[in-house]
Amino acid sequence: MNWIQLLTGDDSDTQGASDRSAYERDYDRIVFSYPFRRLQDKTQVFPLPEQDFVHTRLTHSLEVSSVGRSLGKMAGEEILKKYPELVDIGVSKFDFGAIVSAACLTHDLGNPPFGHTGEDAISDFFSSHPGGKFFRKLVSAEEWQDLVKFEGNAQGFRILTDPKYQGLKLTEPTLAAFTKYPRQSLLNDPIAKRRSQKKFGFYQSEKDKFRELAASLGLKVLHPGAAWCRHPLAFLVEAADDICYHLIDLEDGCRMGLVSEQETTEMFAGLMGDRFISEKLKRIPGKNERIGLLRAVSIGILIDQCATVFLENQPQVLDGSYDQALVDLIPAREVLAEIIDVSIKKLYRSEMVLEIEAGGFEVLGGLLELFTAASYKHLFDRQALSRKEASVFRLLPESVKITLTSETSVYAMLRQILDYVSGLTDRHAVGIYRKLKGTSLAGWR
């Protein structure tokens, strides 16, 4: 792989107008897009937070984007020194920062309601629920794998390339940097040790789009037509996400009283090393302000360390032999492992998280049971359509019904239903579920 092709591909106008680059336009278009705004009411870790200081997917994405911009600019500055031909075609360190920042902004765009539990709930419906298992023989093996392994990354790529969001029209480098897992769901011989093979990044419905993207940017092929090496900047996107959720989840947990201030301070101090000055910290009034300062300094340290690892492994990144998370090789990796262990025990398994996650299975499973059955019978088995199912189908948004009636395959129909359900915010999903179950009706008290 080479940087000139990786940063331009077949895009004819990557520099854009004089006021902003095409990559900066990517960022702006994402910010003003409807799918991005929906992240405001989607779970990060603590579902449906009542406290306004706990992160949602929206605030998390903005913070990851900020960290990604710094990583991109730091890496870009050094890459330009090594490859002056990039300067000759007008590439700057700000272009690296803009690409990574825009890709980071979209990294959670495909996540369903209720966080990662939402992914499990959707997958579980098709793999375990009779209403979902019904579709097994009506789709191909590859399509079935897409359904029983719902993947937010693949859903995000679908959203970013969906014709209904034509206003996005993101550049190829941004789309590729977004794709952390450049492979399809069903792979006969996955390379288990490769980080980029752990999940998948596109559905069968978008397979041709990714294949064209990979060819345009010159991504190295691992499995013809099925799996590729990552775009190098995807490693920086992943690192920005890792940095933010490891540290900011801990900060949120401390604010909510799930982790003590002393334990949180000790872990941040381990990351900061000589830069931790306890006397300075004591002069800051308020727990939230003290923890916020420690988090800010720690993020800066991890940015420097991740950028260094990325640059040290440039040859291996470009030839496709490097395929690890940057945070796994930084000096602070052992302290990060401790933070992850504490987060699993005290945050992700806390009662408030587990209660809402269990509810997420009920809500999403219930919505899918009703909407998939009603849509299938409306399109493919009208005689079997019950009055209740006809009412459920009519409750779908008009835009969804219009799209559904144009579909000719069961897989395409299911993808449209999943687009709708996974795109719901947490509160909207709960509200629709209550109405369909008759526990919340207009005009009733």
Model regions: which residues?
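Acidic, low-complexity proline/glycine-rich segments
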Residues: 25-37, 328-335
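Substrate-recognition/cap regions that form aromatic- and gly/pro-loop-enriched pockets
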Residues: 312-399
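Intrinsically disordered or highly flexible coil/loop and linker segments, enriched in small
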Residues: 36-40, 131, 165-169, 184-188, ...
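C-terminal amphipathic alpha-helical interaction region
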Residues: 388-439, 445
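A short small-residue
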Residues: 42-52, 342-347
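Low-complexity, highly charged intrinsically disordered N-terminal segments
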Residues: 55-59
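Hard-cation-handling environments
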Residues: 275-327
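Sequence-structural signature of the catalytic-core scaffold of metal-dependent phosphohydrolases
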Residues: 1-19, 31-42, 51, 62, ...
